[in-house]
């Protein structure tokens, strides 16, 4: 394999842009920390960190495969490996299968409940990229896909799925819809032109308000989670920090400028990080 081909595969998996991996990793760590009520099992932690990297990469590959005929018409995505011809559709599918199989082999080291849950995760990862053609709610499907690691991680750590798992699942899904709508605001004009659907288009002039409401509901549910587990001040400080970051994001998107909307999206990495840190300290 040539250096250029390897570089194209690397870019196709978005290994040069880790934001998506981080946004998937943080809620996975939330689940592991809460399920373990502190430090998770090291084997489980390693499997899920590696699994997050592999599955996020697989998701990027199948997403670009699904979008290969439209990415060439969007300024931000014209130079991606598939529309630029550096990777063929067949090569992308083979890479997706290799990543998916590698992820599944990792899951096979977990308990039966986790293995059963993994099948739904694979389905969600595969269908999400195609939703933008059929519904204005692809961000909802991303919320489901990015949140599915939560019940899987919880099951791997505790071998059970109490109802609170789905509460944490909902928290992350709401947050994901909010930040992916910010991301969709970057491409809104191009998406309207080529017929791709998104919540940014659906919400229209109410986009900032609805993002704000989703963020507010996320914070309220986080506070309730802290009360349920009787967590200490460190967790509430992390929720307060997340709220401050949400306010900053609202400031960034106030004029709907592409670059600033993208910065708001990237800022969500810090939201996930401070919440993971707050949970870890609270359960320590």
UniProtKB/Swiss-Prot annotation:
InterPro entries: HB_polyprenyltransferase-like, Prenyltransferase, UbiA_prenyltransferase, UbiA_sf. Keywords: Cell inner membrane, Cell membrane, Magnesium, Membrane, Transferase, Transmembrane, Transmembrane helix, Ubiquinone biosynthesis. GO terms for molecular function: 4-hydroxybenzoate polyprenyltransferase activity. It is found in: Cell inner membrane. Its cofactor is Mg(2+). Its EC number is 2.5.1.39. It holds the Pfam family UbiA. It is a multi-pass membrane protein. The chain crosses the membrane at residues 18-38, 42-62, 93-113, 136-156, 161-181, 209-229, 233-253, 264-284. Its main location: membrane. Belongs to the UbiA prenyltransferase family. Catalyzes the prenylation of para-hydroxybenzoate (PHB) with an all-trans polyprenyl group. Mediates the second step in the final reaction sequence of ubiquinone-8 (UQ-8) biosynthesis, which is the condensation of the polyisoprenoid side chain with PHB, generating the first membrane-bound Q intermediate 3-octaprenyl-4-hydroxybenzoate. This is 4-hydroxybenzoate octaprenyltransferase.
